[in-house]
């Protein structure tokens, strides 16, 4: 039989507590921890000479233990006649000065200002269970009355939201409010489902109210107090600690590869995020060495967006290859300084050990793993704010291949790389104009952002490579026709790598880009080497409106129209493009804007199979011939949609495509002093009819 109240109403019922204590008899029920787990914080705020009122004392041994270590001015009150009688009998001989009285905590009858401390162990929680909190409010008012100026209300509580909110809002004016979180202090014999952390609320009475709220939170009994600006911030911080403790409770219950909880560790002083930890358990069927219980993997700085670390599938693969029962994957945050691997290990060790799987031996050595043994490298080189997408960061990072990469990150989705370009040193860029680069050649890290430039002949995104390769479907006669150069309309600029590549390497190609966000254009020009000229232009505006305007004018046609635009609505199962871009009405406008040889290319990122089928059905209703090229390891696929099936059958890949791909490869290489690093044939190898 559970001895914890089963419903909230029972907490405030005198009859319930009367029955409860009769059932317990001589066995003390240490409500919310015992003296040993609480003495550190109690001695901090209660002095042996203080006059202490213990409200709702129950048959806890806490008062007896305080008495035995020198606290002799303890007055204990409780609503239960049974417990008061029992406690007086139990202490009559051994503790003659320890008194227990049957009194209502809301009307004690004591003189105002007659106590230095009021000690409460769970009584507030019991009384606050009423919906309106009226009973608890009357008790807190009585506490304020009987305490002297400088006196303290010390309340041991589970800090459920309605309880802590009531107490803090009651004392915030005219009192200093401090909360200690004693996570993990519960009695080992407590119910296994009883996983909430214990908090100690300390409210100090001022003679004169300060001009500002004094609200503080401490971790543990000796943690430095962190000042909070509002009641809402304090309540939020308490809630975070509770959520963390509940997560720990679940993690100690067993391993579960389908659940990947994560938490963020913040800097104690600044409150800024410092580490993000993701817990990845191995599957039950995994064959792991007996001693491989637990390991910590440090993601190199700047690599947290990589598929292996930034996706659920990638993390599962990482855990499987590491061969541990549980792997904690740690990502470091930008704007934080990290000395070295040893310093990071020392900083993380006290926290990560709380995340260990059940059954791990106490003396088990826990390894810290990483790639290359260092912390990686990241340099934030630019920041800004977009009215459309919020804050952004431009940063240079070192990739797994040793090259440096420049990334555009929007902070509202910091795990996603919006745009990426490979970098080369100024010296390498200069020599590249004289000599073609070797694809596998590596370069040393440059000393500063100004010494690094974007390698415009390298496309980081595979779906961009597929789009370039798709130009082969136009035929080489069209690509090499200088009298009628290939015209391209691209919706979605990003860092500008794709349109810049087409302009630089496709003979005489003319590219028009439509971009909604002027900040994105500025970033592309400032940091990603994007250059507007007579063959590469940008129109700022809504892509849907621009296509509608072009279609209504009926004066311009394009050989290629590309959609490479993401959706800001994360609730949909499709992140590229926004749904409006694949409505039948718009697809028909795209069709009408294409030349007879025209090609429509769509970057499709859709996790919802039913939604994907709906998109494909709509595309098929407009275009007679549709091909798909999936991207390995990603959800992306590129749809290549022909305006006309031409000479080949609409349900087969053209037999001449491979030869055209080889010819396009030669043309791209011949059209520039620097060879573009792209394999056109490989990009078209897995083309499928859909």
From Swiss-Prot:
Q: Which gene encodes it?
A: mettl13
**Superkingdom of source:** Eukaryota
- The protein's name in its UniProt record: eEF1A lysine and N-terminal methyltransferase
Reactions listed under catalytic activity: L-lysyl-[protein] + S-adenosyl-L-methionine = N(6)-methyl-L-lysyl-[protein] + S-adenosyl-L-homocysteine + H(+); N(6)-methyl-L-lysyl-[protein] + S-adenosyl-L-methionine = N(6),N(6)-dimethyl-L-lysyl-[protein] + S-adenosyl-L-homocysteine + H(+); N-terminal glycyl-L-lysyl-L-glutamyl-[protein] + 3 S-adenosyl-L-methionine = N-terminal N,N,N-trimethyl-glycyl-L-lysyl-L-glutamyl-[protein] + 3 S-adenosyl-L-homocysteine + 3 H(+)
Please list where the region (Disordered) is annotated.
427-451
> MF terms per GO, please?
protein-lysine N-methyltransferase activity
Asked whether the keyword Transferase is assigned, the reply is: yes
Q: Show the ranges annotated as biased composition (Basic residues).
A: 433-442
A single BP term in Gene Ontology: methylation
Q: Which Gene3D superfamilies match?
A: Vaccinia Virus protein VP39
Known function: Dual methyltransferase that catalyzes methylation of elongation factor 1-alpha (eef1a1 and eef1a2) at two different positions, and is therefore involved in the regulation of mRNA translation. Via its C-terminus, methylates the N-terminus of eef1a1 and eef1a2. Via its N-terminus dimethylates lysine residues of eef1a1 and eef1a2.
Q: Does the keyword Membrane apply?
A: no
Q: Which UniProt keywords apply?
A: Methyltransferase, Multifunctional enzyme, Transferase
Q: Identify which top EC class this enzyme belongs to.
A: transferase
Task: Please provide an example of a Pfam family that matches this protein in its UniProt record.
Answer: Spermine_synth
- What are its E.C. numbers? 2.1.1.-
**Which family is this protein grouped under?**
Belongs to the methyltransferase superfamily.
| UniProt cross-references to CDD domains, sorted A to Z | AdoMet_MTases
